[in-house]
A protein has these predicted regions:
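Negatively charged, low-complexity tracts enriched in Asp/Glu with abundant Ser/Thr
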Residues: 11-68, 99-102, 106
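Short linear clamp-binding motif
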Residues: 1-15
Length: 124
């Protein structure tokens, strides 16, 4: 094998490895996005409850949020985990309130349970 052939073979190998990594990352991102849509649809299924609790449901890429005048609940989806947070707007010094509670979960059902717990904590 010549030096050129060895170089070309190495470059092809690296390109193939890069494509595998990119495909895996894209698949992870698509799964995270699908799970965020799933949680959003579960929460959106009861608009009466959201209105009763003065919650505004929002979704952006990988994030589902519940906004209330006094607090913010969020679920952020990344690498097959869900970071669920609660933030108190009443004591915030800036527009973006820092999370006061945080829990990592693995499933949409667990995220729903933690959001319900955080909502109960805020409304008791």
């Amino acid at each position: 094998m010549s030096f050129r052939q060895a170089f070309d073979a190495e470059r092809l190998k690296r390109d193939a490895d890069r494509r595998v990594r990119e495909d895996a990352e894209r698949a992870r991102q698509e799964a995270d996005e699908a799970r965020s849509i799933e949680l959003y649809e579960i929460l959106a299924a009861d608009p009466g409850f959201l209105a009763e609790r003065k919650l505004v449901l929002e979704r952006s890429r990988y994030t589902v949020g519940l906004e209330h005048p006094d607090f913010r609940l969020r679920a952020y989806f990344e690498d097959a985990q869900i970071n669920v947070t609660a933030a108190d707007k009443r004591s915030a010094t800036t527009i973006t309130a820092a999370p006061t509670k945080q829990q990592y979960v693995d499933s949409v059902e667990q995220a729903l349970d933690v959001l319900a717990q955080y909502l109960a904590d805020e409304t008791v």
